[in-house]
Amino acid sequence: MKWKIIADSGCDLREIENLAPDTQYINVPLTVQVGDKHYTDDASLDIDDMMIEMYQSKDQTASACPSPDAFLEAYKGAENVIAITITGGLSGSQNSAQLAKNMLLEEAPETNIEVFDSLSASGEMVLFVQKANELIAQGLSFEEVVAALKDYLASTKLLFALARVDNLVKNGRLNKLVGAVIGMLNIRLVGNASPEGTLNLLHKAKGQKKAVQAVWSEMKKNGYKGGRVVISHCSNPEICGLIQAAVHSEFPDADVSSIHTSGVCSYYAEQGGILMGYEA
């Protein structure tokens, strides 16, 4: 195998369409813990079942990163490895991936490997993985692919809109009263990924349509000019259609796609939420 593209399941993409020649894509799963149950975030995960259990449980919930060994097994067997993880601000996945890189280079020092911290998650990671595949398909060298991906990652952004905040309340990150008010008043929390890779609240919007307006306003404020958009949603295709309509109202040829959030991204976005990546 000449190339491997590795992402943890902070990337919602389970497989790549039109995979570049002599290339393999592997999605390394995180796990979500609800009480005494552990859900492995792979293609067999029943996300709806996990979400039901999560909302019914009064116990704290947590996500856990893949082990270095899990990344190492994914890395092995290719001349060139491109890897990306969910932001180090939310998970230890980046640390595991870097440890695995060091382990790989001890075993196979001739391997070319680059491990990226997305400083983001979900839709923005999908954009990165798709771009990596396109660059490899062009026949570029490892160094050229890495340089292009560094530039690309600096040009993409993440926006989120949350309809529920049960996990934030349950895990002590948000006041119970604030969480209850958000639910009762149909408030949507709209924000972005900060340059440091943490989630940053920008707006409190009343209802889904106002949330879409806030998302679209932020996109334009950040220099959106009709680039690719990937909307990762947790069981909310309606908001995807509204965002697509907003984008196409000014950029009718823009490539806007949607995908259901992975298990760990469903855990963070919660029911009705989105984690959207776009090219600024």
Regions found by a protein language model. Give the residues of each.
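Mixed-charge interfacial surface used for oligomerization/domain docking
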Residues: 10-31, 90-93, 97-102, 114, ...
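Flexible, charged surface loops at secondary-structure boundaries
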Residues: 1, 75-78, 222-225
